[in-house]
Swiss-Prot record:
Function, as annotated: E3 ubiquitin-protein ligase that mediates ubiquitination and subsequent proteasomal degradation of target proteins. E3 ubiquitin ligases accept ubiquitin from an E2 ubiquitin-conjugating enzyme in the form of a thioester and then directly transfers the ubiquitin to targeted substrates. Mediates E3 ubiquitin ligase activity either through direct binding to substrates or by functioning as the essential RING domain subunit of larger E3 complexes.
Tissue: Widely expressed at low level in embryos and adults. Due to the high similarity between SIAH1A and SIAH1B, it is difficult to distinguish its own tissue specificity. Overexpressed in endothelial cells of adult lung.
Name of the protein in its database record: E3 ubiquitin-protein ligase SIAH1B
Zinc fingers (RING-type) by residue: 41-76
Region (SBD): 90-282
Annotated InterPro entries: 7-in-absentia-prot_TRAF-dom, SINA-like_animal, Sina-like_RING, TRAF-like, Znf_RING, Znf_RING/FYVE/PHD, Znf_SIAH
Record-level Gene Ontology MF annotations: ubiquitin protein ligase activity; ubiquitin-protein transferase activity; zinc ion binding
This protein's encoding gene: Siah1b
Annotated Zn(2+) 1 binding sites: 98, 105, 117, 121
Source species of the chain: Mus musculus
EC number: 2.3.2.27
Induction trigger: Induced by p53/TP53, suggesting that it may be required to modulate p53/TP53 response.
GO BP term (any one): ubiquitin-dependent protein catabolic process
Modified residues (Phosphoserine): 19
Pfam families xrefs: Sina_RING, Sina_TRAF, Sina_ZnF
């Protein structure tokens, strides 16, 4: 199979828990929804969850908004620090909607599992996956690729499951990132090579692939990175990271292709390093 090759320019420095899908509206469902609505914070309209504190008149406000307030937003009285144990007991029997329900998540779950689910929810806004950039963009999964195409136009995209990722000028000093996109199997993958000083005086390269998609979708693929040349070969195979996870943790834990500058020189030619990238379906 022929490989495509392109130059990567330096950029500078859910799987959700098993869901309880919302069924057709029944008396039980309506009753639960009515109860859940009683826990809505009057400031942010998220839910007030245990531990629940009330003002002297019995009004509730969520723990995120409470530190920002000087008085009760409902009655303007003192906030106080009265804990409402009876309401907390009711909260234990209510199934609360995910905070991303307006974006399409249909899961309802106990308050004890709500925060954990929302951290992994596939409807949570995605951040810009471009490393080394100070881009603060967030949006839906469908909007990620249009954002990259319009705001990060220097990133090259190659078609096919078997390509060459060419990082130029790898001897540049300091922390440097190289980024390229690969499109195959109807999905887009971001290839990232980072050079950073993880330990004092010891620079290393970290290469990884992430899917522009959910964690569940990422599990359907595997990627292989290979340095090849001068009768030497260095290979790494793994499951792509979802852009929901990001790559910072993987790099911190060395859960990617890792090699130091001396190894890079064994495979580089004229300061450029080619990495063979193969994406396959599991």
């Amino acid at each position: 199979m022929s490989r495509q090759a392109a130059t990567a320019l330096s950029t500078g420095t859910s799987k959700c828990p098993p869901s309880q899908r919302v069924p057709a509206l029944t008396d039980t469902t309506a009753s639960n929804n009515d109860l859940a609505s009683l826990f809505e914070c009057p400031v942010c309209f998220d839910y007030v969850l245990p531990p629940i504190l009330q003002c002297q008149s019995g009004h509730l406000v969520c723990s995120n908004c409470r530190p920002k307030l000087t008085c009760c937003p409902t009655c303007r009285g003192p906030l106080g620090s009265i804990r409402n144990l009876a309401v907390e007991k009711v909260a234990n029997s209510v199934l609360f909607p995910c905070k991303y329900s307006a974006s399409g998540c249909e899961i309802t779950l106990p308050h004890t599992k709500k925060a954990e689910h929302e951290e992994l929810c596939e409807f949570r806004p995605y951040s810009c996956p471009c490393p080394g950039a100070s881009c603060k963009w967030q949006g839906s999964l469908d909007a990620v690729m249009p954002h990259l195409m319009h705001q990060h136009k220097s990133i090259t995209t190659l078609q096919g499951e078997d390509i060459v990722f060419l990082a130029t000028d790898i001897n540049l000093p300091g922390a440097v990132d190289w980024v390229m996109m690969q499109s195959c199997f109807g999905f887009h993958f971001m290839l990232v090579l980072e050079k950073q000083e993880k330990y004092d005086g010891h620079q290393q390269f970290f290469a990884i692939v992430q899917l522009i998609g959910t964690r569940k979708q990422a599990e359907n693929f595997a990627y292989r990175l290979e340095l090849n040349g001068h009768r030497r070969r260095l290979t790494w195979e793994a499951t792509p990271r979802s852009i929901h996870e990001g790559i910072a943790t993987a790099i911190m834990n060395s859960d990617c292709l890792v090699f130091d500058t001396s190894i890079a020189q064994l495979f580089a030619e004229n300061g450029n390093l080619g990495i063979n990238v193969t994406i396959s379906m599991c």
